Structures are given as structure tokens and as C-alpha cells.
């Protein structure tokens, strides 16, 4: 028996793949007129499908990507002859964020004011009030002394050690012991 004949007689499992392909083609066909779509070769249609997939993937990742030329505001008709510019229900444009989530997280702490510490958890007020700078004078809980104002202004430098904010502070002290090699002691 010939192997090619057996392969040809087997029912194909490409039904799902062909459905996905036709759905992708229908999505792309909305950007072209009926005449343009009929003139296009299969390879051109596939390349447009991949362009649209790449564009959608990049925007989901948060990159600022320019819209492919065929997806720009071009008046096109679907296969029923309806203009998409007139049909607002079918052509809803979603506003894409211009900024990634990571950039937004770095900006928000600068914009948002710091919350005042609770009186029960404020350990800085006691130690700073009796320091040599204050000459033993008590400070009001809402007012900061001049050294605190200077320290607030001179925060960590932006470009230097950018990863340090990601490190967590250890709750328990970790002690390391040096491991000695018995062979080194003999020498």
C-alpha cells in the first residue's frame, strides 16, 4: 500500500484551523474594499493577518506601536456593502494607555503625598525630640524639624541603584558562619 493514499483518505483535522483562518481573514477584510480583497493573493492576506496579530500583541504588552497602514482610518466596506464609518456599533475604538504599568508605578509615589504616620507607631518623634539638634525641646507631632526637611529633599538618586526599591527588608537577622576546610588547618 502506498502511504500517500492512506494519508489522503484520512479525515482532516484542519476544520478548526480553517475556521480560525477564515475568521482572521474576515477580520482583515473589514479594512479593505470588496474589490481590493478579491484582487489580493493568499500570501498578502496572510501577511496582513500576521501584521494585525503582531500589532495587537505589542499593544497588549504595553508598547507604543504605530498602527499598521492598512488599519488606519480608511473607509472600507464589509461583504454586505455597509460602510464602517457609518456603523458605530461595529467600529468601536478603544483608547490605549500611552504609558506602561511600570512607568505609572514610578510616577504615582511622586504625585501622591505621603500619609502621616500614626501616633502609636511614630518612633522617630521621640528620638529626634531629645537629640542634640533640638536642645531637649519637644516638637509638635505635626511639625518637622529642619533636619527632617533636608532629609526629605535629599532622597535616593534616581539613576543610581534603581533596583533597591525591590529588595525586601529582612525581619529576622541572618547569621553566616565561615566554613573551614580541615585540610587548610593542617597546612
From Swiss-Prot:
Residues 1-21, 109-187 are annotated as: Disordered. Residues 20-83 form the KRAB-related domain. The keyword Magnesium does not apply. The modification Phosphoserine is found at residue 123. One of its GO terms (biological process) is regulation of DNA-templated transcription. SUPFAM superfamilies: KRAB domain (Kruppel-associated box). Residues 152-168 have a biased composition (Basic residues). The keyword Transcription regulation applies. GO terms for cellular component: nucleus. Signal peptide: none annotated. It holds the Pfam family SSXRD. Keywords: Phosphoprotein, Transcription, Transcription regulation. Could act as a modulator of transcription. Belongs to the SSX family. This is Putative protein SSX8. It comes from Homo sapiens (Human). The lineage of its organism: Eukaryota, Metazoa, Chordata, Craniata, Vertebrata. The gene is SSX8P.
Amino acid at each position: 500500500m502506498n502511504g500517500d493514499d492512506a494519508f489522503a483518505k484520512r479525515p482532516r483535522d484542519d476544520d478548526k484551523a480553517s475556521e480560525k483562518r477564515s475568521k482572521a481573514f474576515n477580520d482583515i477584510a473589514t479594512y479593505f474594499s470588496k474589490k481590493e480583497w478579491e484582487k489580493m493573493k493568499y500570501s498578502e492576506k496572510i501577511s496582513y493577518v500576521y501584521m494585525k496579530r503582531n500589532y495587537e500583541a505589542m499593544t497588549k504588552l504595553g508598547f507604543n506601536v504605530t498602527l499598521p497602514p492598512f488599519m488606519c482610518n480608511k473607509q472600507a466596506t464589509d461583504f454586505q456593502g455597509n460602510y464602517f464609518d457609518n456603523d458605530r456599533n461595529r467600529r468601536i475604538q478603544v483608547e490605549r494607555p500611552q504609558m506602561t504599568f511600570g512607568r505609572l508605578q514610578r510616577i504615582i509615589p511622586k504625585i501622591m503625598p505621603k500619609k502621616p504616620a500614626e501616633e502609636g507607631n511614630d518612633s522617630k518623634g521621640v528620638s529626634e525630640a531629645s537629640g542634640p539638634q533640638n536642645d531637649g525641646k519637644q516638637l509638635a507631632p505635626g511639625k518637622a524639624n529642619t533636619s527632617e526637611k533636608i532629609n526629605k529633599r535629599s532622597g535616593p538618586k534616581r539613576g543610581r541603584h534603581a533596583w533597591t526599591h525591590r529588595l525586601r527588608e529582612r525581619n529576622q537577622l541572618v547569621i553566616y558562619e565561615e566554613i573551614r576546610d580541615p585540610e587548610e588547618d593542617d597546612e
